[in-house]
């Protein structure tokens, strides 16, 4: 089963995604993709660690190249946190896939993760509604993230958007 949970900043998407994994999975893996650049990132990482404390998650930190990730065991559920950070790493890190391959690399990574679990829950960001003009690199990031959302929504069994702490169904069940 593949579930995509999207939402804006501080919308509750991570908490909802954790709850979904906990409801569906006895053995749980948290796959962290954020690089700890600066105090703000470190604070977010600490907050997420505190959120999942005591919930039985094993943790793997992997910032890119999920297609080549090899796990030592199967899990009932994997929580991938989050797609936006993973894309930024693949696009902008020197060892990342780069603009020409980031989309395919991430889709291959999702396919790989699904081999290791019954339920994969992916957290991502809704960043498409502010109407501000950005640099070409940022516009490329936004475009690829949107394309990833479309691809993963097509593959997903369920898609939810977290709005003001409320989890709203966008898609439930396979659709053509």
What are these regions (language model features)?
Residues 2-71:
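Conserved P-loop
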Residues 4, 79, 121-123:
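Structural motif
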Residues 7-8, 82, 126, 163:
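Short secondary-structure boundary segments
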Residues 10, 35, 84, 127-128:
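Short, glycine/serine-rich, charged loops/turns that create anion-binding
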Residues 17, 48, 79, 125, ...:
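Residue-level signal for inorganic ion chemistry
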Residues 26-29, 76, 119, 158:
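Residues at the starts of beta-strands that form the adenosine-phosphate
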Residues 55-102:
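Helix-adjacent hinge/juxtasegments
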């Amino acid at each position: 089963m593949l579930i995509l949970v999207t939402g804006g900043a501080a919308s509750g998407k991570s908490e909802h995604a954790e709850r979904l994994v906990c409801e569906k999975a006895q053995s749980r893996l948290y796959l962290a993709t954020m690089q700890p650049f600066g105090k703000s990132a470190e604070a977010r990482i600490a907050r997420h660690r505190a959120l999942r404390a005591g919930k039985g998650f094993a943790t793997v930190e992997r910032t890119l190249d999920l297609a080549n990730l090899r796990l030592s065991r199967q899990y009932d559920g994997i929580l991938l946190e989050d797609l936006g950070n993973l894309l930024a790493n693949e696009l902008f890190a020197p060892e990342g896939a780069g603009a020409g391959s980031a989309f395919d690399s991430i889709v291959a990574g999702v396919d790989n993760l699904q081999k290791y679990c019954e339920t994969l829950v992916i957290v991502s960001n809704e960043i498409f509604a502010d109407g501000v003009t950005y640099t070409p690199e940022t516009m490329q990031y936004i475009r690829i993230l949107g394309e990833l959302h479309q691809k993963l929504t097509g593959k997903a069994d369920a898609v939810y958007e977290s709005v003001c702490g409320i989890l709203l169904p966008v898609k439930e069940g396979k659709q053509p």
